[in-house]
């Protein structure tokens, strides 16, 4: 083998190793990437059905139900436009309450219930995860638009 062929072989081997390393890093990154979705996005089927994701919003008032085993809790997460039922088995954070912000990590089952593997509550009364705050603002804007359209329709029918 000539020196030129050896250099070319070394270069190709180095490129192959770099490509394999890049593929492994991207695969690890992809498997650890968890997206955030609001209840409205989940209801619109924008959330992945087979992958883990985060669901954020408010715990709907009157929705917390504890099952007989003492560890399983069912509740509803809402963004004031849509609601998603959640089931969680484990200890809830001390700050978990109705009407307060929550972010849960888990998957959707076939019935549309979010099966949470982790539940996080906001840490004080002023904090809301940025994604959840944005989702709530968007839902409130949609609700206002719908209310104004309904009011316009009622005014037109009264004429």
UniProtKB/Swiss-Prot annotation:
Gene Ontology MF: a single term: metal ion binding
A GO CC term assigned to this protein in UniProt: plasma membrane
Main localization category: membrane
Signal sequence extent: none
Transmembrane segments: 8-28
Subcellular location as annotated: Cell inner membrane
Keyword Iron: yes
Binding site for heme: 123, 127
Record keyword Nucleus present: no
Topology in the lipid bilayer: Single-pass type II membrane protein
Record topology, Periplasmic segments: 29-159
Keywords tagged on the record: Cell inner membrane, Cell membrane, Cytochrome c-type biogenesis, Heme, Iron, Membrane, Metal-binding, Signal-anchor, Transmembrane, Transmembrane helix
One Gene Ontology term from the biological process aspect of the record: cytochrome complex assembly
Membrane side Cytoplasmic: residue ranges: 1-7
Family note: Belongs to the CcmE/CycJ family.
Function: Heme chaperone required for the biogenesis of c-type cytochromes. Transiently binds heme delivered by CcmC and transfers the heme to apo-cytochromes in a process facilitated by CcmF and CcmH.
The protein's name: Cytochrome c-type biogenesis protein CcmE
Encoding gene, per UniProt annotation: ccmE
